[in-house]
Amino acid sequence: MLPLSAALQTQAQNIVQRFQETQGADCALSSQELWVLASSDFVCDMLQSQPEWLATLRKQPPVADEWQHYAAWLQDDLEEVRDEAQLMRALRLFRRETLVRIAWAQALGQCSTQETLLQLSGLAETLIVSARDWLYQTCCREWGTPCNAQGVPQPLLILGMGKLGGGELNFSSDIDLIFAYPENGQTQGGRRELDNAQFFTRLGQRLIKALDQQTIDGFVYRVDMRLRPFGDSGPLVMSFAALEDYYQEQGRDWERYAMVKARLMGGSEDAYSEELRKTLRPFVFRRYIDFSVIQSLRNMKGMIAREVRRRGLKDNIKLGAGGIREIEFITQVFQLIRGGREPALQGRSLLPTLQAVGELGLLEPQQVQAMSASYLFLRRLENLLQAIADQQTQTLPQDELDQARLAWGMGFDDWSALLLALDHHMQAVRAVFNDLIGDDSPDVGEDPDYQHYHSLWQDALEENELAPLTPHLDEEARRQMLRTIAEFRHDVDKRTIGPRGRDVLDQLMPRLLAEVCPRQDAPTALLRLTQLLLSIVTRTTYLELLVEYHAALSHLIRLCAASPMVANQLSRYPLLLDELLEPATLYQPVAPDAYRSELRQYLLRVPEDDEEQRLEALRQFKQAQQLRIAAGDISGALPVMKVSDHLTYLAEAIIDTVVQQAWNDMVARYGQPTHLQEREGRGFAVIGYGKLGGWELGYSSDLDLVFILDCPPEVMTDGDRSIDGRQFYLRLAQRVMHLFSTRTSSGILYEVDARLRPSGAAGMLVSTVEAFADYQQSEAWTWEHQALVRARIVHGDPLLHQQFDVIRREILCKPRDLETLKREVREMREKMRNHLGNKQRELFDIKADEGGITDIEFIAQYLVLGYAAAEPRLTRWSDNVRIFELMANYDIMPEEEARALTQAYVTMRDEIHHLALQEHSGKIGNGQFAAEREQVRASWAKWLG
């Protein structure tokens, strides 16, 4: 071992003094013991508080294969455990003592890095399995044993994912788990019968609490269940059949990647364990060589790069360029492409799989050797870093003492020597990574005309010198471009961008000008682009992105030229520039039904307990998806109806996630309302009104939401801080509103308007389903019934969904006097026109003026309210287009009229979308849409005149 540096010698002297103060002046520590104690505050603190652990270390020093005895050692500790509180304490103390032993052996070089990873994984598996088995017996005593239809007892199987599954867990880590049970059935032999899903859900909840909950003794592991089917919104535990259905029908590529390392905890070789393995294997490894995965892997590469930029991970040895994540990624590339045909590539552990990659000739021997050496180097460094304070971090320290600890632990004389070796390893990884999934975009700088654009940027050209580059523009347009360039240079000079930033900008601008100058709209495009660049010019990373990825620059120019809204959005939130890297997804947004899955994957990178990061990530996801939708709109890939569909499904996915987050927060604080033990779902639903309810959201639409609950009055929550059940739901709704409206650096999520609830702003924020029905039957105004035409459940359990649909149908189908209805609808429209109507006669307000969109909506609402009593099927849809279709189908309105109104409606909405992209108001010249407006006026006179 190297001698201790000056900083570590000082630390060692302080430790001797501390131990003598707490354990007596005769307390003696050997030089080896001081080495370890000086390298880790965690070990030092633990041995001070538990001196008997030091005695055990001296009597029984750690050995490499002692992980095989963990289960027996822990079982001895659990013999005296009588309740869950004692269980939690025993698990936490066992973890801490064992981590001290692992850190001890690691610091003294008594175990290799691979052996250390195996010990850490074995410790986690032992704690998980022992806690599960103890709690399973306890739950069986309470509720009986879960059995299938034949009376065979059913176990809880646990899949360890990620590094835990691969036997490569780091020192201070989350654990990713998935719970499953073989078959449905009921419990037998208990005081009350439960179905198996309920039993295993409760067992899973208790297991998570036993491992995850912070107590005076700390926690065992942070448990992350988000890799399970449907993530947070899915059931905690699923049967084998449900798992198989999900992965066969809905499993995504990224879930295949996650499943590569999945391993059953407990090493079971029983029939149920083998059945689960067989169920999952076809999903993970395809029988053919799967080159289709390359594009998905390119997307993942982009995600890694974006992660580094988003979180400023320059010194991160896991996620930074050439870090641990890239080594894992390289190995998985070959597993996923060829694993179905090459059994040697189906292993969970990285190094043996990497060795197999080399033996199959898929990487050069020197590449495999370099990658293996880099992996072991980085994993040892990661573990030493985390062992300092038992903290989950992969960021190199700024603190001089911690730097000295790592240099000594890695066998280097000083910090700079360690950094030199680290840089060598990470560059070797990055070279293989880039070679494997490269981006071969041509370099604009190779264009023979490049020097002209270089001069345009660097030199103060005259208008006549610009003419050869822009022969299609007139003199005024050229003068405008030269002014824009000069003003941009002047503004940049006032910013502090440093020599590196200046160099990158000087590379970027000729490339940008080479693409902008040939455009017909060059002056406008250049103005928008320079305004955007000015907002990011001090953030060199983004300038480098545009230099490195020619395609990204091209897409940026195209989108900014087409839409000032997009340009301004990119200026405000430069993170969105990352979206330009993937043209395949930029102009083709995800399938409307895939937003939930995409959002779930996006949020997996964010710690569940970090609210600030989750709020930020939600906003970033929304902005990125809206950019894609706008790009599809601009390119013509998405017609207006599809634009609104995408914006609506995006909002619904976000509503799901926000309600889930609010629910998790409330349950952690108060527990769940007790009546949920007797019913499916959560007793809570969100109704979408207006544009959300009608699948007609625009780019800047707010959300009209109403909350309803199903909870008997006497119910309380089951947490330590128990509150009234209905109070729980009120706070849940308030929490939802808060999560939507909180302003982060990425702005708010959506403006939410809850004033359409019963009694409006004066009413309760959340209503019981009975109160909602009573209000609609007895107190609601006609305009509130009009609003109900465009209402639907956008989030909620099936029972409330069904109840709301019944209420809505009954209200809309009430017999109404047509003359009275006409008068009330006309009066409401007149009020709106007086309040919101356009006062400029030379302009036409597409939405609010006579013959516009609101008139069309009122005609649709009048027809539903007036004729649904005779034809209840008119209540089926909440969007205007399909309402007019129903009117024609059921002979309420002539087909030609319905088609004409639909055409007018879609055409005007299309114009509003495009005006929004141009950041224009919804007012246009009074002569436009003359035919459409005439049709709307005629229909208004016919039905409501």
From Swiss-Prot:
The gene is glnE. HAMAP family: GlnE. It catalyses: [glutamine synthetase]-O(4)-(5'-adenylyl)-L-tyrosine + phosphate = [glutamine synthetase]-L-tyrosine + ADP; [glutamine synthetase]-L-tyrosine + ATP = [glutamine synthetase]-O(4)-(5'-adenylyl)-L-tyrosine + diphosphate. One of its GO terms (biological process) is regulation of glutamine family amino acid metabolic process. Residues 450-945 are annotated as: Adenylyl transferase. It is an enzyme of class 2 (transferase). GO terms for cellular component: cytosol. Its cofactor is Mg(2+). This is Bifunctional glutamine synthetase adenylyltransferase/adenylyl-removing enzyme. InterPro entries: GlnE, GlnE_rpt_dom, NT_sf, PII_UdlTrfase/GS_AdlTrfase. Residues 1-441 are annotated as: Adenylyl removase. Involved in the regulation of glutamine synthetase GlnA, a key enzyme in the process to assimilate ammonia. When cellular nitrogen levels are high, the C-terminal adenylyl transferase (AT) inactivates GlnA by covalent transfer of an adenylyl group from ATP to specific tyrosine residue of GlnA, thus reducing its activity. Conversely, when nitrogen levels are low, the N-terminal adenylyl removase (AR) activates GlnA by removing the adenylyl group by phosphorolysis, increasing its activity. GO terms for molecular function: [glutamate-ammonia-ligase] adenylyltransferase activity; [glutamine synthetase]-adenylyl-L-tyrosine phosphorylase activity; ATP binding; magnesium ion binding.
